[in-house]
Amino acid sequence: MKSLVIAEKPSVGRDIARVLNCKKSGDGCLEGEKYVVTWALGHLVELAAPEAYDKKYKEWKMETLPMMPKPFKLEVIGKTAKQFNAVKRQLFRNDVKDIVIATDAGREGELVARFILMKAGCRKPIKRLWISSVTDKAIKDGFSRLRDGREYDCLRDAAMCRAEADWLVGLNATRALTCKYNAQLSCGRVQTPTLAMIAGREEEIRNFRPKSYYGLTARTSSPSLSLTWEDQKSGGMRSFDRERMERLLKELRDQPVKIVQVKRTPKKTMTPLLYDLTELQREANKRFGYSAKETLNIMQRLYENHKVLTYPRTDSRYLSSDVADTIKDRLAACGIGPYRKLAARLSKQTWTKKAAFINDAKVSDHHAIIPTEQFVQLQHMTVEERKIYDLVVRRFLAVLLPAAEYDETVITAEIGGERFTARGKVMRTQGWREAYETSAGTDSGADSSFLSFDDLDDETDEEEERGGAVRVKEQTLPDVKEGTVIAGAGLSLTEGKTKPPAPFNEATLLSAMENPVKYMESHDKAMAKTLGETGGLGTVATRADIIEKLFSSFMLEKRGKDIFLTSKAKQLLKLVPEDLRKPELTAEWEMKLSKIAKGELKRDAFMGDICAYTEELIGEIKGGEGTFRHDNLTNTKCPRCSKRMLSVKGKNSQMLVCQDRECGYRETVSRTSNARCPKCHKKMELRGKGENQTFSCSCGYKEKLSNFKERRQKEGAGMTKRDVAKYLNKQNQEEKMVNNPFAEAFKNLGLDKQ
């Protein structure tokens, strides 16, 4: 008799099959003496669409709402039906005695496998593989300690509750809003609060009124010293009272400088934490301009294809004690090229399980992202993969190094009874900073855009920026003694203005989604704690998709790197019920889902509350008195229905979309390409259709697509006609993916998945 192993993806299935010596190819599987390994393609089964319950739901009508299925049905996803049938045949083989769930170790991974088993009607015994990386060693260790599947029944219940609750609230609210206002409007408990946070930031910026502030600087030439005035009452370095500062300037001029204190304090900067996915996405956006989705895709390749990094969709920044035992193996694997010298030195050390980066209590499903024990071939990676790999390896090396130590010197002086200070820093030991220096051993193939110490250690406090706080700039300080009197200081008045909060970009929006507590109106400490523990709005696995889909549904637009709401999103926030705009809804759900996963709350009790809430929500939408106005109507008529089309701006394209939701026609007017302008090297837009497609740059340069192809070939840039065609085909496929805005909106209600 054999065990059937169900992996989440083919690549993981093949890795498991290789380790288990399953070499015989079968019907959507690989087979060995003891195991048969098959795989899903992500989700193969999902909750059924409304029309599966009643034909009346095919038409979107307010009178059919709310839709309340009892029980919920499952349906096979059409495009993956072939693989589902292959898995089902393996499930019911006479020689298969039990099932090993080897999908991702987490709530959604559990749901992938359980939905398959439920839809297939398979009731064979279940075992669970729970691992954080797919290296051979991790797989072997995992199979040596398989767990009873019944231990995860509560996790399954929590996953099903999350899916069903999102279906009830998301689909019903979206249909109600769309029918009520005759516009393509979708909402959900994650995407809508995300929009509300951006709206709040935009309002802060609109309402901001800059205030001028003033300070004093005293400079001496012998010794060379720059001193900053400090308010003796508040300790601040600036004042909003110009008259006071001008008066002080006159009073203190030509007064001697007396050094009253020279204080040297030994200090440390602790090692930064390891990366979880959100922190890595933030860093990649800040350093390289990668979107959250791009970073996740790159990470996925490094995890699945290269197998050099651990599981990417983690929300932990720590390692478990069992993983700590493998550090030397990981150093040996990543200790090549630019990391060789430092990795070799570190491999001679030992680490206790009391190290700051080891904390079993802060690792749930998966530990932080670190290198695997797999041998690395940097030459097989793309430039983008190298950059992300470099971030992770250097952070891994950094946490194995001690704190950076330095002496901070603060000179306090008096001029006419007023206090002035100067600050300087002298490094004593580099500590973890060594991992971010070229002295770690870069080679010709290494990317030059590594993080510097300042990038990591000098995070500007947003509240200080808003308030116009002034920091004393560090400088190389002269050797002066207390009691020294210096004559001839030059005083000058400094002036600045308070700054508004910056608009969100992808990095800061990810931070806000991860920590939305300050955007909560409620002061409920339990809710705030839950949002903190569960990772805020969405999960590390879904935030990138949520942001991307808000762009594709024309709720967000980019101006440079900054993100802004479209008119559509602003109107939606006025029309949607207040509950759906608040992070508190997610916090409340997560508190209950966490209890379900622990066996402390029954599934039926939670779903009863959700059904009641859905009824209340739809009633509120039905009774709404607002209106929706298309303020982006053009004079271009839809070629299908002749109605005027809407001009909409996506993340990387300008489009015309039919205003009639039933028609759904759309066409691309222009899209940002990766082709660079030969004059100014900015990215060019591709406009037009067919043979008339033309690249256009903001500097005024234009070039037909046909000429572009010829030029690229002549330049020997490595882009053939086939490459260009492949690129354009990819752009077209992306366009097709959103060609039916209605189908997309509701198919993707899962964008609120946890």
What do these predicted regions represent?
Residues 1-163, 456-459, 500:
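Intrinsically disordered, low-complexity regulatory segments
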Residues 2-4, 80, 91, 174, ...:
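Basic, low-complexity terminal or inter-domain segments flanking catalytic cores
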Residues 1-2, 102-105, 182-186, 264-273, ...:
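Conserved short loop/turn motifs at secondary-structure junctions
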Residues 239-273:
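Metal- or metallocofactor-binding catalytic centers and their adjacent structured scaffolds
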Residues 94, 114, 138-220, 264-268:
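C-terminal or mid-to-C-terminal helical accessory/interaction module adjacent to the motor/catalytic core
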Residues 306-307, 554:
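Glycine-centered, phosphate/nucleic-acid-interacting loop/turn motifs that mediate DNA/RNA or nucleotide
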Residues 24-29, 124-125, 149-154, 175-179, ...:
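Active-site phosphate-binding and catalytic loops of NTP-dependent enzymes
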